[in-house]
Amino acid sequence: MKPLAAPANHGVLGQQEKQSLPADFTKLHLTDSLHPQVTHVSSSHSGCSITSDSGSSSLSDIYQATESEAGDMDLSGLPETAVDSEDDDDEEDIERASDPLMSRDIVRDCLEKDPIDRTDDDIEQLLEFMHQLPAFANMTMSVRRELCAVMVFAVVERAGTIVLNDGEELDSWSVILNGSVEVTYPDGKAEILCMGNSFGVSPTMDKEYMKGVMRTKVDDCQFVCIAQQDYCRILNQVEKNMQKVEEEGEIVMVKEHRELDRTGTRKGHIVIKGTSERLTMHLVEEHSVVDPTFIEDFLLTYRTFLSSPMEVGKKLLEWFNDPSLRDKVTRVVLLWVNNHFNDFEGDPAMTRFLEEFENNLEREKMGGHLRLLNIACAAKAKRRLMTLTKPSREAPLPFILLGGSEKGFGIFVDSVDSCSKATEAGLKRGDQILEVNGQNFENIQLSKAMEILRNNTHLSITVKTNLFVFKELLTRLSEEKRNGAPHLPKIGDIKKASRYSIPDLAVDVEQVIGLEKVNKKSKANTVGGRNKLKKILDKTRISILPQKPYNDIGIGQSQDDSIVGLRQTKHIPAALPVSGTLSSSNPDLLQSHHRILDFSTTPDLPDQVLRVFKADQQSRYIMISKDTTAKEVVIQAIREFAVTATPEQYSLCEVSVTPEGVIKQRRLPDQLSKLADRIQLSGRYYLKNNMETETLCSDEDAQELLRESQISLLQLSTVEVATQLSMRNFELFRNIEPTEYIDDLFKLKSKTSCANLKKFEEVINQETFWVASEILRETNQLKRMKIIKHFIKIALHCRECKNFNSMFAIISGLNLAPVARLRTTWEKLPNKYEKLFQDLQDLFDPSRNMAKYRNVLSGQNLQPPVIPLFPVIKKDLTFLHEGNDSKVDGLVNFEKLRMIAKEIRHVGRMASVNMDPALMFRTRKKKWRSLGSLSQGSANATVLDVAQTGGHKKRVRRSSFLNAKKLYEDAQMARKVKQYLSNLELEMDEESLQTLSLQCEPATSTLPKNPGDKKPVKSETSPVAPRAGPQQKVQPQQPLAQPQPPHKVSQGLQVPAVSLYPSRKKVPVKDLPPFGINSPQALKKILSLSEEGSLERHRKQAEDTISNASSQLSSPPTSPQSSPRKGYALALSGTVDNFSDSGHSEISSRSSIVSNSSFDSVPVSLHDERRQRHSVSIVESNLGVGRMERRTLMEPDQYSLGSYAPVSESRGLYAAATVISSPSTEELSHDQGDRASLDAADSGRGSWTSCSSGSHDNIQTIQHQRSWETLPFGHTHFDYSGDAASIWASGGHMDQMMFSDHSTKYNRQNQSRESLEQAQSRASWASSTGYWGEDSEGDTGTIKRRGGKDVSAEAESSSMVPVTTEEAKPVPMPAHIAVTPSTTKGLIARKEGRYREPPPTPPGYVGIPIADFPEGPCHPARKPPDYNVALQRSRMVARPTEAPAPGQTPPAAAASRPGSKPQWHKPSDADPRLAPFQPQGFAGAEEDEDEQVSAV
C-alpha cells in the first residue's frame, strides 16, 4: 500500500491541527503504473531513465571507457569528440525523457472522467489518493470508496473569485484538493480553508445556507464535490452496513459490510474498531474473504494498544485447550513466530510461553504443527554474539555439547549450568554454535570443537537457536543407541509426505543432501548443505511451490492484498517464489527465504581467490570457496608451488603491516575459514615451512604493502563502490524488524530501541556528508572535478542496483551549498556528466508527492532487492498515523492499524530476496549492455534479470577458472572499497565544510560597498544555488548591460529540469455562477468548472508541456518568459545581493535536489489584460550586503523532501528583483508554478531528509523573510501577521524526528544572530525565489498581491505537526518598506563566484529594453514561440560571435515574435530608472570574462 499524502503546507480545520496535510494535490497523484497497457516501457515512461530503450545501453560507452576491467580509468583528458560518442545518445535520451506521455496525471484523468465512466481501477486510484485527507479522516474505506465513485472535479482558475456568497443555499459537500479559500464572516472574522479541508452540507437533506463569503486565495484552486443527495445517501448507508457487536449493553466491536468489487463475489464483514479484548478474541474467529490479513495485522500492531504480549499469550494457551479452537490457535502462534520472532527472543516470559506451547503440541500429538513451529524458530532466529571468560584453560566448560561433523551435524548446546556465566550471557539448550573466536563451527568435529573451547580462556561465541535440527540430532542419537550403529540416511529416507509446504520441502531436501555428503566430505546438516538445495529449489521452484509468483502480485502487493481488493498494477515475470501463498493451515514460513536457507552464504563453488606467497616472494593464485579452511589452502598451495613435502610441514601465515610500519606475522589455525574475507589490504598470506624461521616479508615488501593499502576514491571502481554501498545499505534495510517501524511511529519503548531502523536512517546522512567531505578536501581543482564525476557515476550505478537511498544521498551531497558554489570546478565537468547528473536529480523531483520516484518504485520491472528512499517511507507512515485517530468512540481504530500494517508489509517485501544480495548486486553490474537501460524502464530488463542471474553468472564463473588473477584483482578492488568505506572520516559540520569550500574557491568581491549599508558579519558563507553555467565577470566601471555575445556553456547543470507534466491552466471562471444552488440546476457550476477545465487542459497541453531537454541544453540570457514583463527589483540602499542570473528565467527545480540557479524559461500564453513586464538586472554594490548570518532555524519542513535544500539561507540571496509584480493573475500555468522551486540553497542541511511531497515546500516560507511584491510605483505594504514558523507546513517533520540532532544544533545558537540584522537587512529582501508565477500557488505562505490586493498568508499554515512555541516565535518585521519608482525598476545581477553564464539565446528570444517598451497592457499578438521549437532551431543556427548591434533584430527573432520590436539596448546614462544605481559601478562585461549581466 502506498499512502500518497504528503506533508502539510496549509491550514487545517479546528482540532485537526495535529494532522498533516498533503502539500499540493497536483503533486500527489498515484504512480503505480503509468502505462498498464504498454508492455514496452521506454525510458521516458520510467520517470528516471537516462538511457534509451533500444536494447543496448546508451551509457555503455561511458562504462566501457571509464570502467576498465581492472578498475576505473579516467579518460577525461582525452578529446571528448573523438571518444564520447554517447553524447548524442545522451542528448536524445534526455529529450526523450521529456516525452509528453510522462505528463499523464493518473488521478487527474480519473477525476475528469464522468462518474458513471469510472472503472473499479479508477476508483481505487482515487481512493488511494484521497484516503489520507483530513476531510476523509475516520471514514471507513467503503465510505471513501463510495464517495470516490460519485465525486465531481472542479477548478477555479483565478484567485479572488467568489465561490459562495453569504446566505447562498448549499447543494454539495466539497473537499479542497489544491490551493486555499478564505471565508469572510459577516462579523469580519475570516477563516482559511486549505488543501484537504472540506466545506458544504452535512449528511442530511435539510436545506443549509452558506455563512460568510468564500473566495479563492490562490490561482488554480481544485475541488472535488459530492452532491448533497449522494453525500447523504452514502453516509447514511454506512449505518446500515455497520454490524455492531454488543456485550452487556456496550458496543465492543464494529464491523462493516464491504463489497470489494462490483461483481459481488467478494463481500463480507471486516473489523473496523473494537475493544482490545474483543480484537484479541477475533484472532480465533472466522475471518471473511474481505479481511484475510487480520491475524498478521493484529500481531504487528497489538503493541499499540496492549501493554504486554503475554495478554495475548495467556489467552492463546487457554483457547488451545478447546479442541474446536486448537487449529486456529496453532495457526496464530505459527504466524506470530514466523513474522515477529523478536517478540520471543530475549523475553523470558514469551520464551516460556513458547516452550509451554511446544509441550502442548507434543501432548496432543500434533507432530506436523510442532515441526512447523521448530522450522519457524530455526528460520527466524537471529545470530547472537556472547563473550565468555574462563579463569584458566583447565576450568571446565559450563555447558555440554552434542553433534559434530562426524554425525553430519553442527555443534549444539545440550545443557547449560544453571548458575553459570553462560546462562547469564543467554546461552541455552538447543543453541547451535556457529563460530568461536573467528573459527567456523558449522563443519567441525566435536573433539576439535571441544579442544578449541578448552584451550582458550576468552571465548567470543556466535550462536543461533536451531531447535529443529537439534531435535533431529537427539532423535538420531536415540536411534543409534537403540540400533547400536550410526545411521547414514539415503535419499529414500525423505519422509513420505503427501504434500510439501515450502518449509517442508526446503528443510527435508536440505537435510538429505547434507547427510548424503557425509561420506564424501563432512558437511554439517544445519541449515546448510544449502548450495545443492538451492539448485534443487531453483529447478523445482516453479513447479512445486504454490503458483502465485510475482507476476500475480509483485512487490507492492501480496496475496492478502489482492484478496482485499487492491489493484494489481505490477506485472513481474514469475522468477521468484513469493511468500504469503500457502494455505491458511500452513502459514508461510519462508516469508524471507534467506532467513531459513541462509542465502547469505555464497555457493560452495570455488568463487574466491587467494594470493599465496612464499618466502622468496613468488606467488600463486588459489581458487577457494568461503568454507575452505586454512589447512585445505596449504594443501592446494603446496600443489601449486610444486613443493615436495607433506602438508603437515607447512602452515598458512598472515603477514600484515601496521600504519606505523611494524610487520606482524601470525600462524592461522587450520580450521580458519572465510580466508578471502579476512585478509587486509596491508596483509599477505604466506606458505610457511614450520621447520624454518625465515623472514617472510622484507622491509621493502612491507613498504610496498603499506603503499598499496593507502587508497583514494579516484583509485576505486565506481561499480564496486556502488555495489558495496548497496550491500551495506541492503544489509541494514533487511535487518529492520517490522515491529521497529511501529515502535518508532508510536514512540513505544522496546528492548531493541529500533536500533536497526536508526542505523538505516543515519546512513543517508553519512553518505551525504561523505560526498561533500571528499570533494572539499581535495585542493586540486582538476581532481575535484574528477571526484564529482566519480560520484555521478557511482550514483548511476546505485540506480542500477536499485539503491535509491545512496543515490539520493550522493545527489544531495553534490547539491550541498559548499559543493554547489564551486563554480569553476563545475565548469570543468564534461557536458555529458552534467546531463547525467541532471537526469539523476530528475528522478527525485519532489513534485506530486515524488511521483517520478514512486513511478519507478512501483514499476513493472522492479524486483527485490530494492533499497527505497527512507525519508519517503517514514513520511508515508507518519501520514497514516497522524491523519487518523488511534481511538474512535473509545474503541481501537483497527482500520488505521490495518493501513499501517499494509504499508509496512509493502516495505518489507522490498527486502525479501531469495539469493545473496551481494550476488544480485554483482550480477547486475555486469549487465550494462544487455539490460538496455540504466533505469528500470527497459522492456526486457526483467526477463534479462532472470536469465542473467543464472546464465550470466555462470559465464563469469567459467571465465574465473581461466583467469584467477582477474578474479583476484576484482576481489582486491572490493577489499579496497570496503577498507575505504570503513575508514571514512566524515566532516559533518556545515561551517567546516563552508570553510573548506572557501579555501577551494575563495569568494570574490568586485563591487564597492554602499556607504549606508550595514554589512553582515560574514559575506560569503551563504550557501548558493547550484551552478548556473559559466559566468562573465562584471567589470565595475563599465556601463550596465552591454549586449553579450552568446558563449558556449556546459549544459547539464545550469538549469533544473523542467516539469514533464503539462500545466493545468484553466480558463478563468470569473463569469461562471457561484457554487450555490442559484445555478439552474444543482452542481451546474461544478460541472461547468470541471468540463471547462478538462477542455482547456487538452487544448493547452501541447503549448504548455515543457521539454526537459530545453532546460538542460539552453536557457536564454534574455527573458523568454511569455511576453516581456517588468520584474521590479527592490534595490533598497544597496542591499540587493546575489541575484539570479539576469532575472530572466523560470525558477523551476523540477528535478534538482537543490535547485540550480539558472532558471528554466517557460512560455506562458498571456491574456489581453496582462501587463507587460521586463525582467531587469541590478548589480549589487557590495557582496556582503544583505548577506545575513543565517544559520537558520531549521523548521520541520526544511527537512522536507520537497525542500531539498532548506531555503532560508539563500532565498534571500536571490534578491527581490526576481519577484514579478503581478496585478494580473495568470502569470504561470499552475504546474510550472508549482515546480518552480527555489534556487535553493541553504547549506543543504536537511536536503537529504527531505520528505515533503510538494516542490513548493522549497519556496514555501522563507524563514524570517517574506516574499512580497513591489507595487509598480510607490510603497510596498507589509501585512505580516503570521508567525514565521506557522507559515511552513510541516509535513516533513518526521524527518525532523529522524534527523533532529542535526537541526537543533543550529536552532538555538543562531536565533540571536538571526534577529540582529533582520530589521535592517531582511526587510529589504524579497524572497524572490518563491515562484515566478507565484500567483499560481497560494500555499507558499508568502504575501502576495493579486489584482491589486494584498493577500496575507498568516493562516495558511496547516501543519499537521504542531510547531513548538520556540520555533514559532514571530520575527519582527518592519511594517512598511518604501520603494521608490526608481528602485522598483532596478536590475538583477549575479554575484561573481556563484553563478555561471546562462546558455546561449535561442533564435526568437531577444530582450526588449525597458526604455523602449511602453507601460500598460501589452498587445495581444505579442507572444513568444514555443520554447521547444525555438530551442530546436537554435541548435541549427550558427551562434554569432558578436552580439547584434542595437537596433538589429536577428531574423529568427523577428520571425518568431511578430509584433514585437526586440533589440539590444544599452541604457543611456541619463535613463532615470537607472539613476540610483549609477554610482554603484554597474557594469557590462566583455565577452571573454566570467560574469554576464543582461538587461532585458
Curated annotation (Swiss-Prot):
Mutant lacking the gene: phenotype: Mice appear normal until 7.5 dpc, but become grossly abnormal and dead at mid-gestation. Show severe defects in yolk sac blood and major vessels formation. Show impair callosal axons to cross the midline during cortical development. Show disruption of all three midline commissure fibers crossing, the corpus callosum, the anterior commissure and the dorsal hippocampal commissure during cortical development.
Pfam families the UniProt entry points to: PDZ, RA, RasGEF, RasGEF_N
Protein's name in the database: Rap guanine nucleotide exchange factor 2
Binding site for a nucleoside 3',5'-cyclic phosphate: 135-254
Record PTM text: Ubiquitinated by NEDD4, leading to proteasomal degradation. Phosphorylation by PLK2 promotes its activity.
Keywords: Cell junction, Cell membrane, Cytoplasm, Developmental protein, Differentiation, Endosome, GTPase activation, Guanine-nucleotide releasing factor, Membrane, Neurogenesis, Phosphoprotein, Ubl conjugation
Compositional bias per record (Polar residues), positions renumbered to this chain: 1246-1256, 1306-1330
PROSITE patterns on file: CNMP_BINDING_3, PDZ, RA, RASGEF_CAT, RASGEF_NTER
